[in-house]
Amino acid sequence: MDQRKPPATEEGWYALHDCRSIDWDAWREAPQRVRDRALSEGIGFLDAYEAVEDADEGQTAVYTVMGHKADIMILHLRPTMGDLDAAERHFEQTEFAAFTEQEFSYVSVTEASGYTEKSREYFEGEVDDDSGLAQYIQARLHPDVPDEEFVCFYPMSKRRQPDQNWYDTSFEERAAHIKRHGDIGRGYGSEVSQMIAGSIGFDDWEWGITLWSDDMRHIKELLTEMRFDPSTSQFAEFGPFYVGRKFDPSELPAVLAGQRVPTDDASVPETPADVAEHEHAPADAGASHSHAEEPTASGAQTGAHAGGDTDSHGGTHPGSASEGDHPHSEESSDEDDSGSSSSSGGRPDVSADFEEIDDAAQRLGRLGLHEGDAYDAGDYALVFHSSADAEDIVDDVSDLESNFDHYDRHVQTAVRADSGQTYVVSIWTAKDAAETAAGFLKDIDGVDEQLGGSLGEGVEGSETADDSDAQAAESSQSIRETLESAGVYAGQPHGEDVYALVVYSEANAETLDEEVTDLRSAFERYDTHVQTTVYGDTDGDVAAVASLWDTEDAAQTASDYLTDLPGVVGRHGEGDGFGTMGMFYTVKPEYHEDFVEKFDTVGGLLKEMDGHRETSLLFNHDDENDMFIASQWDSQKDAMAFFRSDDFSETVDWGRDVLADRPRHVFLA
């Protein structure tokens, strides 16, 4: 048999149809705080990809999916397969992804083939690039996802049976089939849009077909007519069909609430972040932005995508100021121009009535926030004192922080405690952004003293940060070498050290255990997670949550979630001193009491040592033989004096017989 002639083809954008189901049971059981964060991250992901912040060009859209096969479908079109690969894995890093399961996916590339006489002229280079035909083919290869309400996606292949083998037919016969098939499709051109993507070698079928229409009956009528065409009846095989409806990322809360979408804003369920916006952040009448509408408190775009650093395709680049400088700013109506601050509109009072100070960096240092770790030189900080207890305002501040995070000039906002006093700290890369944030922070319960100041100069600050980092690394290495010489590591390589975070909480044990159980389930999705445990003292006065990670980056990311736990009053070891040495011990059950007595003895010695602040023995709520010791010191010199002492060496030697596992020592400074 003669070799059959394949058609010429040209490829355009790569396509990924990512179909996911929602774990509805897990969603219903999740705490509201977790659901709010998941929605915020889901909206943020979809907004960023619809704005094509990740590539030079492309398209992204999201749809509900009806039936049992999936609940949502995310469609990505990008110039390279690498873009699709990154997008798929990026989604998995969001909190929202934890509530989804990928039920089906399809990888393909938009395709135009040279079966018709006109298209063959294009492939043979006989038409100008600006001709109507060339522009039509390019539009097929780089399509705009239409705004039609309904989508229908399905994969298909050409039949390869002995008496019905598409690939054994002549080029002329195939071309005749394609022409007749195309004539049917053109008859529905005003009612149905299509995207044809080839997938030979990419996926299990040979093509992926995507159809859009404002009336699903038009798609049904089109496909019904095509089924009776010989090109389909004799040669087509079809995979599963996925039918859904397009929705805006901002409507993700409505989708998860079981509401009808598209929907107007009034019917979208409110999250605490939305409530915070209504109470603290009316529209910014005085702001001037490059687009008509700005992000809402949930991070969604109510109109065009946020502008700013846009490229020729209208997409924004990561790290640009595309979402505007002012937290919660939205387009306002004419009657808002008066500056009223009612819930119906108008800009809140952001007159920057805080006192300017010169020692902002020193104040942050006393609160455990240092240049290079918490901020960069040249940033601007607000430090507001509150007479309220930290645990009473942590939720409100967390809600505002979630809103602020949608603006790229925000660094961080958090509650800090020092010597029994409560502070709200908000750091921004520019003073004008901080001034606007002040208008919202001043409404936090109990706020009285309001201070703000620059955090040094950029160039000088970077040198200081480098020196600080070098000193910290030197300190850590020195102490680790001392511990190793005492045999603490029992031969374990330094590369197996873990990074630990500890937060203190005043919440009751039952509440804290429930919250940490939910958080631990989320952390366990990551290979870098070692353990997250609740520890408490025998009197029940102190509770700590310790989270251990294989990498420092993972620990830093986890810290944001730990501070969201109820009743958090500060991160242990943050302050103006050297910090905390954290020691994790698993004791053999028969030596439990002996270990506690030994700790009491060593604790008495520590009280007499210069520079010692506090050392606490805490027990795992689930296993009393799993213990955590937190030892805080004023300086490296003070800590080294103890770790080099004979008393410490004797304690280490004694511990070899009573410990069920090797001790784990980590620095929390």
From Swiss-Prot:
Gene Ontology MF term list: heme binding; metal ion binding; oxidoreductase activity
Tagged with keyword DNA-binding: no
Domain of life: Archaea
Annotated PROSITE patterns: ABM
Residues reported in the UniProt entry to bind heme: H181
Annotated Pfam families: ABM, Chlor_dismutase
Start and end residues of each ABM domain: 579-667
Family note: In the N-terminal section; belongs to the ChdC family.
Protein name per Swiss-Prot or TrEMBL: Putative heme-binding protein rrnAC3100
